[in-house]
From Swiss-Prot:
Keywords: Cytoplasm, GTP-binding, Initiation factor, Nucleotide-binding, Protein biosynthesis
GO cellular component, one term: cytosol
Protein name: Translation initiation factor IF-2
Organism, as annotated: Symbiobacterium thermophilum (strain DSM 24528 / JCM 14929 / IAM 14863 / T)
Location of the region described as G5 in the Swiss-Prot/TrEMBL record: 691-693
Function: One of the essential components for the initiation of protein synthesis. Protects formylmethionyl-tRNA from spontaneous hydrolysis and promotes its binding to the 30S ribosomal subunits. Also involved in the hydrolysis of GTP during the formation of the 70S ribosomal complex.
Signal peptide: none
Segments for region (G2): 580-584
NCBIfam families with a match to the protein in the record: IF-2, small_GTP
Main localization category: cytoplasm
Residue ranges, compositional bias (Low complexity): 57-77, 147-168, 190-231, 254-265, 352-375, 383-395
Length: 1044
């Protein structure tokens, strides 16, 4: 949308009241309400032209009266003076490049020049008093401007010593100048647009004359020059020039061009900007007749040509170079030491060396950046002329229809069409006026260059796809916008995606190919998979150091595993176990001859199969304990299978050899059936007969364990972040979640951040198996760790992470993955369950399990899930660690479940809630008791067996019709009895024709409950009336027979 400008902003730039602009708008039939209304570019230009035209007409009479008056004119208002630090808003709006035929920056510089607007109409030139000035009486015929302005050139009388060098006879009268200008006006009009845009060597101009130079110039001025100076100008002093430097009218471009008091030498180089414009092709301006006047710069200095306000070069005449200064506004004083003011569109000229900054040649009428130590002069819009060429200030082209026609026809070149001028002006604006820079979309200006589209900005370089990527990331990698990727997915693949939706690898490759980008698939290892491993397979072997072995005690129930370990480590552990059965993994360290051995005690019965499997995976040597009196049992076989699956060497300890019925040879014979051949029989399995009770051969057992460890060459790298396995986890009311961790690689230190499964945390404290606090733990060391955010799962991999952010991210990803898997499983099982319920094939016994440690929870869950038969199964809907809470009771209420607690008790609130809702809460200390009770409950829930009992039979002897009832059958009970509430089936020729209930059973006219054998009765059936003689009505009922 085209930018718009408010009325009060336009009025402020035009220097008039908003009311006046509103009147002009109303006269132009533009619908505006107040000064806050907005107008477009064309309307603003129309208003600007109308206001200028009106001001010019009003100021024409004022200019003439001011010329006739000998009294010096009043100083212009401060608001009319140029402000070098300000950039016109209209210039921002109508800057270069928006109107090639006439940049609006000219309008900005012409704004305060209201009296001089119709200068082209004021003729003859004799009416202007400014012709009496010494330098302004040049023949105007030499000015190739489109419109010659009478008395257009003014000189700073006292500052210009050129009066001595110029003969009075050469100064033409205004009438002569007008006649000469009339002859050359037409060719000048054609050359003016192109010439105005070209840069000639700039005329030297000082922003503020140095006092010393001003004094020298005053001494060099001739009496004739002083006589020709108007009375109103004679009062100007050098002091005034020092106090107030010559400034340009910023709104109009009129500039008082101070002459250079000490011009540079003839060989001085021009600025780069002027040099660039000199090299550009210039339209030849017509040569003018009449003598040219050199402008001496000072005593002993070579003369420099004077530049015209419009930059139209004039060929120099013989004898020197000449130039013409630009006139100031009527009634305005020129500063001493400065040349007469320029026209409304002139540019200040280049100063001599040491005299300040020259106006940029061919510039945009903006204030120029001063050199060091010199004030900024005002700037105009014209370009300085070439040496020796004269020119006159260009009249406002808006009022000249010929200039407009030339611009429309393309004859003239835009003044600011040169890219160099525009680039230099824009650069100056950015340096000097950062606050006045227009926005990207210039108001009333040309649309900025279109940014390169995503298609153009695309870098067609290969990308690497390491995994699923979101639409946003894929678009960023390819250098396109997300909208393009979404569009391609929809149109090319029919996928409706959002910006954050993840795309799989194959889709990413296909989308990249649609954009012409080569995609390489590189499978990046998932961070979860990295932290799921304990050992690094790529770790160099030279970094590993020897470590002590980890030994697992395995075997059948009550074969003496814990007793043997207790005997080894000299601690009474078995006495603390409920029922003498180990309930969860214990990890202990023993030392023999300075060498350590870590023992893991795993429960032996089949309920702890999963725990035993984990124990086998973390161990180096498996000690299989077999009782000499029981020999091989089912759990013994299972232990052998787990050890072989984990590739763990097995050492057999034949326990209880002190018993009279012990038979070690039988044990060895039975083990050979499972691939364990003793060394005595030529095998490779070490078998040691021991007695845990008598502590027989314990040292021999330990020595053999160390021998196997040496053969296995156990090594680990202790100089890396720790990694291990969670052996056991529990929730301690005082210390929170606590876990037993076996460090398998690296060194675990207090303060390390870790992740284990879906839990993470920081090591707050570590304790060994004796309860001593540790600061670090190396490989093969079991420790109890505090600092988990939640209770981890037994068997989870424990890994130290670089920071908490990484640990939290891994845990959250694992939680999300587990939830997704659980939801998927629930969806499938729910569908199956609903089908089974609809068919009446299955029933569930919902159970909530709470235990003291995670290992017990898993053991109970596994044991209960095995308790099922053809019609009933146990469904564990929740299992956790800790005391039975009120939330567990509420869950049991909602799911109609029973609560089982193992080594835990319900709290007070949970007990009250259970009593209130009638929830069955049972607590146990031995797992086998749980199994027995659940089996009994399942028997009570078995679907009862339905048996059909025949009550009696009746034969249809007669049929008759009963009003309002239908057909009735007159029957004779031939067997048993028939009752009112029994079910009946109608049998005809051995085929059941109908089955259902009867409507009525009558004997004569009375309703009866039953009719015995040998009696007659009348029977009507529900929805059946087609009785026939000989049909048999069989009465029966269904009875439930409970399973024993």
């Amino acid at each position: 949308m085209e930018p718009r400008l408010r009325v009060f902003e336009l009025a402020r730039e035009l220097g008039v009241d908003s009311k006046r602009v509103l009147e002009v708008l109303q006269s132009l039939n533009v619908d505006v309400k107040n000064h806050m209304s907005t107008i477009d570019q064309k309307t603003a230009e129309k208003v600007t032209d109308a206001v200028r035209r009106t001001e010019a007409q009003e100021g024409q009479g004022a200019g003439k009266s001011a010329a006739k008056s000998a009294k010096p004119a009043a100083q212009p208002k401060p608001t009319r003076e140029a402000n070098p630090a300000k950039t016109s808003l209209l210039e921002d709006f109508f800057g270069s490049g928006t109107r090639p035929q006439r940049p609006l920056s000219e309008k900005r510089e012409r704004r305060p020049l209201t009296e001089r607007r119709p200068l082209a109409e004021r003729r003859p030139l004799a009416e202007r008093p400014l012709v009496d000035r010494p330098v302004t009486e040049r023949p105007l015929a030499e000015r190739p401007a489109a419109e010659l302005r009478p008395g257009a050139a003014k000189a700073a009388a006292p500052a210009r010593p050129a009066a001595e060098a110029q003969p009075v006879a050469e100064r033409r009268a205004p009438a002569e100048a007008a006649q000469a200008a009339q002859a050359e006006r037409r060719p000048a009009e054609k050359a003016q647009p192109a010439a105005a845009a070209k840069a000639a060597p700039p005329e030297k101009a000082g922003a503020a004359p140095v006092p010393g130079a001003v004094a020298e110039q005053k001494q060099a001025a001739t009496p004739a020059a002083a006589e020709q100076k108007p009375a109103g100008k004679a009062e100007q002093t050098a002091g005034a020039a020092q106090a107030k430097p010559a400034r340009a009218e910023a709104g109009t471009g009129a500039s008082s061009r101070p002459a250079s008091a000490a011009p540079a030498a003839q060989g001085e180089k021009r600025p780069a900007a002027a040099a660039e414009r000199r090299e550009e092709p210039q339209a030849e301006a017509p040569q003018t007749s009449g003598p040219s006047r050199p402008v001496p710069a000072g005593p002993g200095q070579p003369a420099r040509p004077a530049g015209s306000g419009i930059g139209v070069p004039v060929k120099p005449a013989a004898g020197g170079k000449s130039g013409l200064g630009l006139p100031t506004r009527p009634g305005e004083k020129a500063a001493d030491g400065a040349r007469g003011g320029g026209s409304g569109i002139g540019l200040p000229v280049k100063p001599a060396a040491g005299q300040g900054t020259a106006a940029r040649a061919g510039g945009l009428g903006l204030p120029q950046k001063p050199k060091a130590g010199a004030p900024r002069p005002g700037g105009g819009l014209g370009a300085p002329q070439r040496p020796g060429r004269r020119g006159a200030p260009l009249a406002i082209p808006k009022l000249d229809p010929k200039v407009a026609e030339q611009a429309k026809a393309g004859e003239g070149k835009p003044r600011y069409g040169q890219s160099g001028d525009k680039r230099r002006a824009d650069l100056y604006d950015r340096r000097e006026h950062p606050s006045s820079q227009p926005s990207e979309e210039k108001l009333f200006g040309q649309r900025p260059k279109r940014k390169a589209s995503a298609q153009e900005r695309r870098v067609l370089k290969p990308i690497t796809v390491t995994g699923p990527m979101s639409v946003k990331d894929l678009a960023h990698e390819m250098g396109v916008t997300a909208a393009e990727v979404i569009k391609t997915l929809l149109t090319g693949f029919g996928i409706m995606a959002t910006i954050n939706q993840e795309l799989d690898v194959d889709t990413c490759v296909l989308v990249a190919s649609e954009f012409g980008v080569e995609a390489t698939v590189e499978q990046k290892e998932d961070i979860i998979e990295v932290y799921d491993r304990v050992e690094d397979p790529d770790e160099p072997a030279e970094l590993k150091k020897p470590r002590h072995p980890v030994v697992t005690i395995m075997g059948h129930v009550d074969h003496g595993k814990t007793s043997l370990l207790d005997a080894i480590r000299q601690a009474k552990v078995a006495a603390g176990e409920a029922g003498g059965i180990t309930q969860h993994i214990g990890a202990y360290e023993v030392e023999l001859n300075g060498r350590k051995i870590t023992f893991l005690d795993t429960p032996g019965h089949e309920a702890f199969t999963a725990m035993r499997a984990r124990g086998a995976n973390v161990t180096d040597i498996a000690v299989l304990v077999v009782a000499a009196d029981d020999s091989v049992m089912p759990q013994t076989v299972e232990s052998i299978n787990h050890a072989k699956a984990a590739n763990v060497p097995i050492l057999v300890a034949i326990n209880k050899i002190d018993k009279p019925e012990a038979n070690p040879q039988r044990v060895m014979q039975d083990l050979t059936q499972y691939g364990l051949v003793p060394e005595e029989w030529g095998g490779d399995t070490i078998m040691v007969p021991v007695s845990a009770k008598q502590k027989t051969n314990l040292d021999l057992l330990l020595e053999n364990i160390l021998v196997l460890a040496e053969v296995s060459d156990l090594k680990a790298n202790p100089d890396k972040p720790a990694a291990g396995t969670i052996l056991e986890a529990a929730l301690d009311k005082a210390r929170g979640p606590v876990a037993t961790v076996l460090v398998q690689a690296g060194t675990l230190n207090t303060g390390d951040v870790f992740v284990a499964g879906t839990s993470w945390g920081r090591v707050r404290a570590m304790f060994d198996h004796r309860g001593r606090k540790l600061k670090s733990a190396g490989p093969s060391t079991p420790v109890r760790v505090l600092g988990f955010d939640s209770v981890p799962q037994a068997g989870d991999v424990f890994r130290v992470t670089p920071d908490e952010k990484t640990a939290r991210a891994i845990a959250e990803k694992r939680i999300a993955k587990a939830q997704a898997e659980r939801l998927a499983q629930k969806a499938i099982s729910l569908d199956d369950f609903m089908n089974q319920v609809a068919q009446g094939e299955i029933k569930d016994l919902n159970v909530i399990v709470k235990a003291d440690v995670q290992g017990s929870v898993e053991a109970i869950r596994g044991q209960l899930e095995k308790l099922r038969n053809e019609e009933v199964k146990v469904k564990v809907i929740h299992a956790g660690v800790g005391a039975i809470s009120e939330s567990d009771v509420m869950l049991a209420v909602a799911s109609k479940a029973i609560i089982i607690g193992f080594n835990v008790r319900p709290d007070d609130r949970a007990s009250r809630a259970a009593d209130e809702h009638g929830i069955d809460v049972r607590t146990y200390s031995v797992i086998y008791d749980i199994v027995d009770d659940i089996e009994a409950a399942m028997k009570g829930m078995l679907k009862p067996k339905i048996e059909e009992v025949i009550l009696g039979k009746a034969e249809v002897r007669e049929t008759f019709k009963v009003p309002k009832v239908g057909m009735a059958a007159g029957c004779m009970v031939i067997q048993g009895k028939v009752t009112r509430n029994a079910r009946y089936r109608l049998i005809r020729d051995g085929v059941v024709v109908w089955d259902g209930e009867i409507n009525a059973l009558r004997r004569f006219k009375d309703e009866v409950r039953e009719v015995s054998e040998g009696y007659e009765c009348g029977i009507t059936l529900q929805n059946f009336h087609d009785f026939k003689r000989g049909d048999i009505l069989e009465a029966y009922e269904l009875q439930e027979i409970k399973a024993g």
